[in-house]
Structures are given as C-alpha cells and as structure tokens.
C-alpha cells in the first residue's frame, strides 16, 4: 500500500470519530511515519522484535493547567501496521483502532483503561 492511500485511511479514521470527541480534539498534530526509531522503542521498553503501531506525545487534556502548550503529537506508524495486516480491509480496521487508541491518550485515558474498553 502506498503512503497516500495509507494517509487517506488515517484521515478517514479521524473523520469517523464520534462528533463529541472530534469537537473536543484540539491542538493535536496527527502524522504518519514509516517506522518508529530505535530510540523511541527503547525509551518505551519495547524489546527487539516488538511492534509499535502508534504513539501519543503530549499533555493529556485531564492534566492541563492552562497556558499555551505546544501541540500534542500522534504518530501512526505505517510499517508495523502493514506488516501485521493481510489486506486493505484489515489495514483500515487496524488504523481506525490505533487512531482511537492514541486519541484516548489525548483525552487522559491510561493504557490500562484503554485496554479495558477493548482497544
């Protein structure tokens, strides 16, 4: 799958979020990268051979105290997603899952809380 098609799936996943979340999503950059770098994987404690599909970097809305902040950043990693998916339908579903997961972090949900919801 080419980058343009993959980025289109990321945009579609964002547009398909429920309106109550879209309306509160602010000051967030959503980017696509091919693969996470080794420094990122090591920093997150991901061992060799482990995969990272997405990454939220920023201050969750629940922890903000005011003032101007740099935009949060959500990175979706195309390489790992394409590696585990067998067809475009699976890629679309995985991208949607990862986008929802990372946006949940933006709204202050922990990894444990997100996993309890099935994402």
Feature map (PLM): residue ranges:
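Active-site rim/adjacent substrate-binding subdomains
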Residues: 1-94, 106, 110-118
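Catalytic glutamate of the conserved HExxH
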Residues: 98, 102, 106
């Amino acid at each position: 799958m080419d980058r343009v098609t993959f980025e289109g799936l990321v945009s579609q996943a964002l547009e398909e979020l429920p309106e109550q979340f879209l309306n509160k999503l602010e000051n967030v950059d959503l980017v696509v990268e091919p693969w996470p770098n080794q420094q990122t994987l090591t920093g997150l404690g991901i061992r060799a051979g482990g995969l990272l599909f997405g990454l939220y970097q920023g201050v969750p809305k629940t922890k903000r105290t005011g003032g101007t902040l740099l935009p949060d950043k959500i990175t979706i990693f195309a390489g790992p997603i394409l590696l585990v998916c067998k067809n475009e339908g699976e890629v679309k579903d995985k991208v949607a899952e990862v986008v929802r997961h990372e946006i949940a972090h933006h709204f202050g949900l922990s990894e444990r809380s997100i996993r309890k919801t099935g994402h």
